[in-house]
């Protein structure tokens, strides 16, 4: 499956060139934004960790081993990419214990930048956002056109697709999810079950968003929509008055799409009909999610790009800096600009 099948159409037209992303880990930097002041005391040791070429789960295992504790006592807010330079928080539960010597966890792929005590463990999803610094190298394209498109993106946002990373290599997770759905069964292994259910929900959401992008309504509220603020999980129905709410124009308020699950959809009108039609086209996945007991949720269709800045360190490098809400994908921004090609290859675009 290619990225058009997994995501959908671009909002701003065809790619304006090509580039390489992640030639080195430093080309994709992520800083977790976590607004939790540490109390300085408590049974939980929090660690601000920088990792390079290491995924979050591997880092957690290394931290647990160095601390001499079971892996289940190590917590983190969110998963970060392996092929990147990332900084994020971990917590380790140490009831009645002094701070352990964590040096055994450190090497050239993991550094502990600071530590502190807190009364509570770090919860999944506790981070509010992620800050990104991306460096696109071997850039081939019209920089004036790229600048103009970036200005549009800063003003209007982008479609909030789940990135291709969610779906595995060539969409393999979607294939696996469909096979389980046809069998009306769930994987016994918890991680596999969670991964495939998440894949199915994300895929259905992307198909709804793709239809809204195709009809030009992805950033426009219409009667029957459910609206949500950027950083809120709650939503409310849109009537005529809500469709002209000025907060829509300043990218504070957005139409939403379905995270499929059990229960009736609270959408109505044309929005309800579109979402039901998309789900009917993937009836096995829809029913699988309902029968698995997934709850009906919503996700904003439009993604505002916080603090977007860019410059060209050299003629063939574009550096982007921006902030995204937790759970949103930096690569969908890159996709609105250029096609990505593998390192060492600049003629044939690849799916990323």
Swiss-Prot record:
Its EC number is 5.4.99.27. GO terms for cellular component: cytosol. It comes from the Bacteria. Keywords: Isomerase, tRNA processing. It catalyses: uridine(13) in tRNA = pseudouridine(13) in tRNA. It is an enzyme of class 5 (isomerase). It holds the Pfam family TruD. This is tRNA pseudouridine synthase D. It comes from Pseudomonas fluorescens (strain SBW25).
